[in-house]
Amino acid sequence: MQIQPSMYINRELSWLAFNSRVLDQCSKDLPLLEKLKFIAIYCTNLDEFYMIRVAGLKQLFIAGISTASNDEMTPLTQLKAIRNYLHEEKYVVEQYFTKITQDLEKENLFIRSYEELDEDLKQQCNDHFFSNIFPVIVPIAVDATHPFPHLNNLSFSLVVKLCDPMHPELLKFGMVRIPRVLPRFYQVSSNIYVPIESIVRHHTEHIFPGYKLLSSAAFRVTRNADMEIEEEEADDFMMILEQGLKLRRKGAFIRLQIEKGADEQLIEFLSSHMNIFHKDIYEYSILLNLPSLWQIISNKEFTHLLNPVYTPKILPPFGDNVSIFSAIDKQDILAIQPYESFEPVYQFIKEASKDPKVVSIRMTLYRVEKNSNIVQALIDAASDGKQVTVMVELKARFDEENNLHWAKSLENAGAHVVYGITGFKVHAKVAQVIRKEGDKLKIYNHLSTGNYNASSAKIYTDVSYFTSKEEYSQDTTTFFHILSGYSKSRRLKTLSMSPKQIKERILDMIATEASHGKDGVIIAKMNALVDGDVIKALYEASNKGVKIDLIVRGICCLRPGVKGYSENIKVRSIVGKYLEHARILYFKHTEPNYFISSADWMPRNLERRLELMTPIFDEHSRAKLAQILKLQLSDNDLAYELDSEGRYRKIALNEAEKINNSQQILEEYISRIFNTLKKDTDHSRAAHLATKLFRDS
């Protein structure tokens, strides 16, 4: 089957459409600070997109590479399309932010400039400036003897045009660098926040004494943060990575954000020194550095402007005074975060670290929080003499420094730390505990779609699978041997791993459904669908009559609903208060027919990373996955549907139609089950009843 370029949606534009769906949450009937959250998330996402994706396209363009992607867009045409998209969307961001801040004022929560304050509050700002701001800000002159300074990625500064009152014709240009140690806003009272640049601007003549301020503008820079490491040539990978992190701080400037109405001479001064394209300059009529809005969102006096806090539940067979290993020994257990608590995952490692019967702990770490209880448990286990092997992925983007810290701490405690296989990132999420029971060794496993990170587990939807079945244990053992030793074989028997094996298995299962024609069914939930071979296979299956439902939160390069290609394919995206992160697959004619995976359907996951795909044999666990997919396919509140033109549309409801919010329903389901079973002391019986209640809800 020949696939026309028009049947592929551009990857970068599809990502921008996803971020637009994040921004679109501001149009919904949400508490005001929840809307402010989505603006902060949107801006943070966009920062990373520019640092990596736009930076990469620019490098290709500068290198003279004009190779087109599957959709026949060259690096230059993609850059033009991205800029056009974002310059248009800038106005949408401004409108949402302005409306939200106006509505917050009705709730007695204000963002005020220095000039808008009364005299008492101005004096308080003055005192704060001289006590806390003036000692740490950095005034910078730029002239023949003062070169243009180094500006850190995402740094926030004030650019100024000055003159000596005695010689007003002699213009001076300079900057005030605002260190990150200073909060973005000064909370001058419990309900009033003053942007720091407003206070600094008012005191410019104290910063540059004897000079008159002619004009000023707040600005923010973005640098290329993509980092290439020649692993094959590295004798000490940790040292090479540390050097790479230092070099990344000096990446080329790729975006300038500046206040709207800024003096043209100031813009020219910055852009000429940064060597930045004019179309990569974004002028905003609202505040800059909006990822820092979390400072306001976290105000404890305005929690009524947030969603009610949901407390994740611990369901049977887990519970107080229940051994993790005893529970897993009796049955496989599938948990869904954040509806179910992440605590059993932590307890799995903590109990292993203290259990005298445990002889070995192995696990992978990709993204962990700065104060990780899980890593501390591993350190404790290693310090106590247990055999601890940890695969720390040092190349996890923007977590490199944190992972370096933990790798060194683990090594110092006596753990065996490995950094994976040359040329591949290790993205699989797996932990293994080996326990001496009688005269035999028993292996317990945890396989997951999400990171070992208690912080992200509160806001990311993921699936955890605990099992002690031998067929899984054999494969997890092989997987860890591959990571820590030499192995030319990278194939597993029950689990599938990438590179290669997961993709082969997926293509085989798609082909199996295609062979069943109209009786074939595929349901796949993931973060991104980019791989051209998989997309082609899905088109071919659709042409054979297979019913295909795809739940793709982010990038989707497949174009659904096109006659002769994809009329049997539907694509939807779920965007809500939790970030959909789980990968769940269903193939009707495969046994077993449910899978969870750490891998998205992207070339990088299927060909350039070590990932795991886990078949789910356990009936109760499959029932849980089936209900999750059913709920998400019936969601008409958080869901957007992708049409054949590549546009995402909200689902239109008639007046009689009931609103189905899959995330809210899952909260209610899990809470109902928890409340029904919390007094049942027979944890095994309660676990089976929990599955039945979930399935029948």
Curated annotation (Swiss-Prot):
Keywords, comma-separated and alphabetical: ATP-binding, Kinase, Magnesium, Metal-binding, Nucleotide-binding, Phosphoprotein, Transferase
A Pfam family reported for this protein in Swiss-Prot or TrEMBL: PP_kinase_N
Residue sites binding ATP per the record: N45, Y460, R553, H581
PTM info: An intermediate of this reaction is the autophosphorylated ppk in which a phosphate is covalently linked to a histidine residue through a N-P bond.
Record keyword Cell membrane present: no
GO biological process, any: polyphosphate biosynthetic process
Name of protein: Polyphosphate kinase
Species: Campylobacter lari (strain RM2100 / D67 / ATCC BAA-1060)
